[in-house]
């Protein structure tokens, strides 16, 4: 029996990280027990030698499960999906499954990396705070427009139907962070706005939103 079979999972996370937020939602939706390990990015705790041993890039989240270390939100969620197939996050229908992958990829490749803390700090340093906000909003709008087109005709109560799926784990944190952190007007994106309304009514999504909103306000002040 491997050590991962018997040891409690540890999640290294930062409260304001939308990437880590995805994993926390997945763990709760699957009903999995885990130990929360806070990593304060503002204090540079992600750059300590101890943390860099877990992820040389210095990013959160990181999941440790026995002797298994995974340092990427999508990789972590796919590991959880295969290791713990109960309460699945991916539908059996191949078209819906592909839609979930595409929506998650738009967030992970075309939105979040271009407006994360490190990138925005660099842009502010080089070009000023006004350009930082303009940059972030430009890439969020571009990604949200693509998501609206992708999910049109496929969304139900949630992104790809009436059951929570992988796509929702990536959309919910991104949408609320865009509204609260960057002042995005979701009236331009009616489908995503409708999804966000549904997320706010769902226990595991709502719990995370209620915690993150005041933290974002504090971080901006």
From Swiss-Prot:
It comes from the Eukaryota. The keyword Lipid biosynthesis does not apply. Its EC number is 2.5.1.18. GO terms for biological process: glutathione metabolic process; L-phenylalanine catabolic process. SUPFAM superfamilies: GST C-terminal domain-like, Thioredoxin-like. It catalyses: RX + glutathione = an S-substituted glutathione + a halide anion + H(+). GO terms for molecular function: glutathione transferase activity; maleylacetoacetate isomerase activity. Pfam families: GST_C_3, GST_N_3. It is an enzyme of class 2 (transferase). The keyword Transcription does not apply. Glutathione binds at residues 17-22, 60, 72-73, 112, 116-118. Keywords: Transferase. Residues 7-88 form the GST N-terminal domain. CDD domains: GST_C_Zeta (cd03191), GST_N_Zeta (cd03042). One of its GO terms (cellular component) is cytoplasm. Induction: Accumulates in response to the phytohormone ethylene. InterPro entries: Glutathione-S-Trfase_C-like (IPR010987), Glutathione-S-Trfase_C_sf (IPR036282), Glutathione_S-Trfase (IPR040079), Glutathione_S-Trfase_N (IPR004045), GST_C (IPR004046), GST_Zeta (IPR005955), GST_Zeta_C (IPR034330), GST_Zeta_N (IPR034333). Residues 93-221 form the GST C-terminal domain. PANTHER family: MALEYLACETOACETATE ISOMERASE. Conjugation of reduced glutathione to a wide number of exogenous and endogenous hydrophobic electrophiles. This is Glutathione S-transferase 1. The lineage of its organism: Eukaryota, Viridiplantae, Streptophyta, Embryophyta, Tracheophyta.
